[in-house]
């Protein structure tokens, strides 16, 4: 099944502590319905040092996944959140913005 939100899409956060912020999708977990967005939903992970691998311990900031329902793709023409539709053009399934029928 085709995904409405894919890697490298510009998205806006609709709910949560980062509501209203925009960022680029870095990873999509299709089975879980989650996405990772660059610089959004940062958490602090406490790690122990691993002497065998020369890894220092400490507090590491990393991105946590967001539910795909809490993000919306940003229409580059309007700069606002938009919905995505699918249609067949020249035998290929393509995505388009529902507000202005522009291809993504």
Curated annotation (Swiss-Prot):
One of its GO terms (molecular function) is structural constituent of ribosome. The keyword RNA-binding applies. Gene3D superfamilies: 2.30.30.30. InterPro entries: KOW, Rib_uL2_dom2, Ribosomal_uL24, Ribosomal_uL24_CS, Ribosomal_uL24_KOW, Translation_prot_SH3-like_sf. The keyword Endoplasmic reticulum does not apply. GO terms for biological process: translation. Keywords: Ribonucleoprotein, Ribosomal protein, RNA-binding, rRNA-binding. GO terms for cellular component: ribonucleoprotein complex; ribosome. It comes from the Bacteria. PANTHER family: MITOCHONDRIAL RIBOSOMAL PROTEIN L24. One of two assembly initiator proteins, it binds directly to the 5'-end of the 23S rRNA, where it nucleates assembly of the 50S subunit. One of the proteins that surrounds the polypeptide exit tunnel on the outside of the subunit. HAMAP family: Ribosomal_uL24_B (MF_01326_B). Part of the 50S ribosomal subunit. Belongs to the universal ribosomal protein uL24 family. This is Large ribosomal subunit protein uL24. The gene is rplX.
